[in-house]
């Protein structure tokens, strides 16, 4: 089993798809990695040679920020916005949508489960 960036890649999948199991690598990035490493996108993970795995691992280590480093950068960017007190930071702090979406209806993913408010009695 190929282990790259601390992640065990699934054996029976094409390497292009298997690389997307690593946080920070999508389909396009996976294709670029394989092109630079000289590995076919149709190769299955279990049929990779150790040399090919080493090439892929080396390219990712040198050129792409993945997993823990990327997660740390994202959280530091959000923390920086909150410390600045800018609008986006305030929205992060309040747990509301950051990019201008409506909140009168919807926005349940950010706001959490609905809390019913008692209506006015007649």
Curated annotation (Swiss-Prot):
Pfam families named in the record: Ribosomal_S13 (PF00416)
UniProt feature coiled coil, ranges: none
GO BP of this protein: translation
PROSITE patterns: RIBOSOMAL_S13_1, RIBOSOMAL_S13_2
Example of a GO MF term: rRNA binding
Gene Ontology cellular component annotations, sorted alphabetically: cytosol; small ribosomal subunit
SUPFAM superfamilies named among the record's database cross-references: S13-like H2TH domain
Keyword Ribonucleoprotein assigned: yes
Keywords, ordered alphabetically: Ribonucleoprotein, Ribosomal protein, RNA-binding, rRNA-binding, tRNA-binding
InterPro entries: Rbsml_uS13_C (IPR027437), Ribosomal_uS13 (IPR001892), Ribosomal_uS13-like_H2TH (IPR010979), Ribosomal_uS13_bac-type (IPR019980), Ribosomal_uS13_CS (IPR018269)
Annotated region described as Disordered, given as residue ranges: 97-122
Self-association state and partner proteins as the record states: Part of the 30S ribosomal subunit. Forms a loose heterodimer with protein S19. Forms two bridges to the 50S subunit in the 70S ribosome.
Listed NCBIfam families: uS13_bact
Family note: Belongs to the universal ribosomal protein uS13 family.
Cross-referenced HAMAP family: Ribosomal_uS13
Role description: Located at the top of the head of the 30S subunit, it contacts several helices of the 16S rRNA. In the 70S ribosome it contacts the 23S rRNA (bridge B1a) and protein L5 of the 50S subunit (bridge B1b), connecting the 2 subunits; these bridges are implicated in subunit movement. Contacts the tRNAs in the A and P-sites.
Protein name as it appears in the record: Small ribosomal subunit protein uS13
Species in which this protein is naturally found: Geobacter metallireducens (strain ATCC 53774 / DSM 7210 / GS-15)
Lineage summary: Bacteria, Pseudomonadati, Thermodesulfobacteriota, Desulfuromonadia, Geobacterales
């Amino acid at each position: 089993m190929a282990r790259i960036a601390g992640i065990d890649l699934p054996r029976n999948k094409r390497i292009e798809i298997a690389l997307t199991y690593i946080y920070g690598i999508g389909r396009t990035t996976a294709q670029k990695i394989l092109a630079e490493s000289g590995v076919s996108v149709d190769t299955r993970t279990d049929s990779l040679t150790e040399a090919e795995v080493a090439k892929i691992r080396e390219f990712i280590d040198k050129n792409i920020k993945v997993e823990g480093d990327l997660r740390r950068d994202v959280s530091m960017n959000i923390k920086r916005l909150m410390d600045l007190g800018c609008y986006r930071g305030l929205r992060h702090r309040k747990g509301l949508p950051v990019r201008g979406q409506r909140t009168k209806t919807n926005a349940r993913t950010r706001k959490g489960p609905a809390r019913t408010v008692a209506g006015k009695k007649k």
